Each structure stands twice: as C-alpha cells, then as structure tokens.
Amino acid sequence: RDRFEGKNFTEVIFQAMHHQFVASALATKIAHEKNPDCKVGCMLTKLTYYPYTCKPEDVLEQQQRMRQIYCYSDTQVHGEYPKYLLQMYKNKGFNIKMTDEDLEIMKKYPVDFISFSYYSSSCVAADTKGLEMSAGNTETAIKNPYNPSSDWGWQIDPIGLRISCVDLYDRYRKPLFIVENGLGAKDTVEEDGSINDDYRIDYLREHIRQMYKSIEEDGVELMGYTTWAPIDLLSNSTNQMSKRYGFIYVDVDDYGNGTYKRSKK
C-alpha cells in the first residue's frame, strides 16, 4: 500500500486486475498457437451465498455479492467487461486505463473452461444486525441455521456444490473443473497411531454425490474433480497445520514442531 500513497487502493487493484485479464488472454493465445487442442481456463474462489430471507433487500444483496465473484469469470469467459462492472467504475470515479488493443485481445482469446474451488456456503442480508456470523474461505458471512459447521465455523453444504455447478454452467455453457474441495478439521492420532477421519470421508462422499447429480440430472459438463488436499499442509486461510485437509497425516504442529512423519488416515 505504501507504494500507492495518494491513490485509491481499490482502483489500483482493479487496474491490476485488468492487466491480469490481458495477460490471461495472451497466455490463451500462445497456448492455442502451440497446440490448437490445448484448453486454458480461469480460476474462481467460488463463494456461494444465499439470501438470509426472502425479503427483496436480502435477495438484492445476494445478487450484488455474487456479482463480486462473477465479475472475473464474466470478463474472461465473454472476453469483455460486464456492464455492471463498468458502471461501478463510473459511479466510483475510477479511471481504469485500458487500450483498444487490450480490449481486442481480451475479446479474441477468452478462456475455454472455468475452474473453481468450493468448500462451503453462507448467507447474506442487507442488514446483519443481530445475526450470527460464520467464518468462510476468505471472509465472514451470516450463519445458515440449516447447515452444520466445521471446526473452524465453515458451513458444510454439499448441495451448495451442485448449486454452484449448475449456476456456473447455466451462466457460461463451458466445461467446469472443480480444483479444490475439502474439509479442514482437527485430526486425533490414536494410541495405536491410527487417525480416524470419518467426518472427512462423509464430507467428500456427500459432495461427490452432489457433483454427480449435477452431471446426471442437470447436464453439467464437468472436466474433473480434485480435492484439497492429498496431504496435510499449512492452511492458507489461517496459517495453521492443525487445520488439516489431507488423506495423509503429517506429524507437525502449528509452530513447526514435530517429526514430519507421514501416516495414512
């Protein structure tokens, strides 16, 4: 932030985003020139929000929040900025520098597929006063009373994965790739050295079932599915080893202490 003293930092972020869009389009161009069959995608941190009530104000808030997610893929899939994003720039007085050549490149080389991460869902409301909040992948939101929570307060919502798949595929009509899905939890090593993580098995089973339904019942074109992650590693959202995702346990604590021995869960 110190480098941009005197500037609107949010505007700086959107300017950087524009450069990323152009770079992505150029990368797609190069990949297709080298191999016409090569597929290049974009990546979304897929936050799924539900309106907390059926009040129009809450539904509008949910729509606005989802636009904050979709503005990236709307641009990279369609090859041009959505009108709502350009209107936001205008309303806020942002002057995002972009050339005609930039816009031509973006239009000519959109992505071929959409990859995304999905861990949980949450609710949003126009007025959050008095409502219980819940943690999430990148931000806090309103707790959904119909969904259980993980050890870190993330809402466990397998059906939300199906909803995400359907929303994305209906919006873009391009193949999807689920590249992150998993449960961060506290694992206990038993006296015999075993680690029983039935809760993680249940989480993955139910999410895979909903993923399958999106294919068989909703017609979603899904390229693939990968979990986060095959082995315990430092959780980016909390900087903790104790927030474990893997199928393989690593003997190390939040402070780097341990043997680093690996064990099958």
What are these regions (language model features)?
Residues 1-265:
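Active-site region of glycoside hydrolase catalytic domains
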